[in-house]
């Protein structure tokens, strides 16, 4: 659902037909995400969450030709944030809760749908940044940075590899 009205409609329909309404954000239900949650403590004080999910839409070429398919119709909640950006934001909220401050920018297409965006979130003692796009590609991973190390997730939408890297000892007198 993309708004409160749709949520109420879905709840009513599930009650009417006696079926279970379930969350569809599959990546947070996987063993790899559970591993991330269980290992956050290894990072020490967490200072940053960064996530990127940019995937050039197979429908964008048609859009550039003037054909607006459903993937770029805002009335269907099919902008980049609602379609794929949510995969970067939802895990962050699950792990760290509601941010104190949000600052966002993006590119709005002629249809009114957002094609891509960047969002900065502020938490107490921590920052988060997410990038998302349906009009460009990226292969950047998701990373959670702490004072004692970091955890990298290869892809936030389908978490395959999770890697913990401990902080390297600081070198005295040479560089950072």
Task: Describe each PLM feature range.
Residues 7, 33, 88-89, 161, ...:
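A general structural signal for well-ordered alpha-helical segments in protein cores
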Residues 33-35, 59-64, 115, 142, ...:
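Short aromatic-enriched loop/helix-cap "lid" or pocket-rim segments at secondary-structure transitions
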Residues 15-19, 42-44, 123-125:
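Short helix-capping segments at alpha-helix termini
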Residues 1-25:
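Beta-strand-loop-alpha-helix segment that lines the small-molecule cofactor/substrate pocket
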Residues 170-176:
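C-terminal helical cap and adjacent loop that interface with cofactors, partners, or active-site loops
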Residues 27-102:
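Predominantly a Rossmann-like dinucleotide-binding segment in NAD(P)-dependent oxidoreductases
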Residues 4, 59, 161:
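Glycine/Thr-rich phosphate-binding loops of Rossmann-like dinucleotide-binding domains
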Residues 88-161:
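Contiguous beta-strand/loop segments that form the cofactor/metal-binding neighborhood of enzyme cores
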């Amino acid at each position: 659902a993309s708004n409160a009205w749709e949520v109420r409609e879905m709840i009513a329909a599930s009650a009417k037909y006696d079926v279970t309404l379930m969350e569809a954000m599959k990546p947070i239900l996987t063993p790899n995400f559970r591993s991330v949650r269980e290992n956050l403590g290894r990072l020490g004080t967490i200072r940053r969450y960064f996530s990127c999910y940019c995937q050039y839409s197979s429908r964008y070429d048609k859009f550039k030709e003037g054909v607006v398919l459903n993937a770029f119709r805002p009335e269907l909640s099919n902008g980049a944030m609602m379609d794929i950006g949510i995969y970067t934001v939802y895990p962050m909220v699950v792990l760290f809760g509601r941010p104190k401050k949000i600052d966002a920018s993006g590119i709005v297409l002629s249809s009114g749908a957002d094609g891509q965006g960047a969002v900065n979130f502020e938490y107490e003692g921590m920052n988060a940044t997410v990038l998302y796009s349906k009009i460009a590609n990226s292969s950047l991973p998701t990373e959670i940075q702490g004072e004692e190390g970091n955890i990298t997730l290869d892809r936030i939408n389908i978490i395959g590899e999770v890697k913990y890297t401990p902080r390297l000892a600081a070198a005295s007198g040479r560089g950072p």
